[in-house]
Amino acid sequence: TYDPTGSGSGIEAVKNGTADIGLASRSLKDEEKADGLTETVIALDGIAVIVHAQSKVTDLTVEQIAKIFTGEITDWSQVGGDPGAISCIGRESGSGTRDGFESITGTKDSCKLDQELTSTGGVIEAVAGNPNAIGYASLSAVEGKDTVKAVTVGGVACTEAAVLDGSYAIQRPFVLVTKDGTTLSPVAQAFFVFATSKDAASLIQNAGAVPTAK
């Protein structure tokens, strides 16, 4: 069975033997590896930073993005755009996309959002309708959209290739966590083999992530 309780709970369950496999949306910490846990990356999640389609801003650094979302940078003219008060659009508390974005940019619990929306589509729509807005969304949700544009981050575009080779900064891994020296049950072993194979790639892609098995 699958019990979606968050990365920490999944890791702890494998550690104490109550689960064969844990799913986490972050890499294992050194102390977790020291406890005999192993991670297997099955997918990567690229988080695009989006602005209005007509915005003059095309590139931002991770530091600039963090300063915008924490209210240190408040006007587009500070980062090469036309003058205008920046409107920050984000996801609601508890959103995996928000958690990933804030963890990577170092803005956890310090983002100052003008709007908190409950769907990726809502964020894209809000940014598309406001020339001064900035937001974030999974790469797969932004691809092919002409109502918003994804800025490059440190000169690197948010593409599958850049996520896979690690050059795009705002990304996180999805990992399967197992315990060293523990034999998986037949069902768990079958799932592990499938999840790490090319056969699972289309399912992972449809869920909005970039599969590592090609």
Model-derived regions, located:
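Exported/periplasmic ABC-transporter solute-binding proteins
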Residues: 1-214
